[in-house]
């Protein structure tokens, strides 16, 4: 019997939010939808290199790769009290959204880590992406994804 080498997008999202970043604290928040989109996109590209299927389709957009399905899942998980979105106003950045798991989300992520065989293979990769990019300046992160994957940058017509 051949093992299925795929993971659901929503599970990837939970694991990304659960993972520590540079702070080494579990459930380190991800600041901004753009950052969340880019980190998940980069994770999926690394999974693709390992032959693991993923579920979020990304399309070209102004700020690079964008997934409507990811936005939909975030809204659903907020509604289900799995993800908490805190909206803060910054003098320098305008309105900013901060994403992290709720207690319910932490339980679900922990269950994934103990009950999903493929997670043991991919979780170290997820932690590495979060550690590397979660505190990177957002402009630099967008430029990085533009440079690495120019096919995901929407061409502005004018």
Label every PLM stretch briefly.
Residues 1-158:
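Domain-edge interaction signal
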């Amino acid at each position: 019997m051949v093992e299925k080498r795929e993971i659901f997008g929503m599970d990837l999202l939970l694991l990304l939010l659960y993972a520590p970043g540079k702070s080494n604290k579990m459930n380190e928040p991800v600041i901004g939808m753009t950052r969340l989109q880019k980190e998940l996109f980069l994770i999926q590209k690394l999974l693709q290199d390992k032959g693991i299927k993923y579920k979020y389709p990304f399309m070209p957009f102004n700020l690079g790769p964008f997934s409507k399905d990811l936005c939909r899942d975030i809204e659903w998980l907020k509604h289900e009290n799995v993800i908490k979105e805190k909206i803060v106003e910054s003098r320098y950045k305008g309105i900013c959204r901060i994403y992290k798991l709720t207690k319910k989300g932490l339980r679900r992520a922990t269950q994934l880590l103990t009950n999903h065989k493929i997670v043991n293979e991919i979780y170290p990769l997820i932690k590495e992406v979060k550690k590397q990019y979660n505190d990177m300046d957002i402009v630099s992160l967008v430029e990085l994804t533009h440079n690495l994957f120019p096919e995901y940058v929407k061409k502005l017509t004018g």
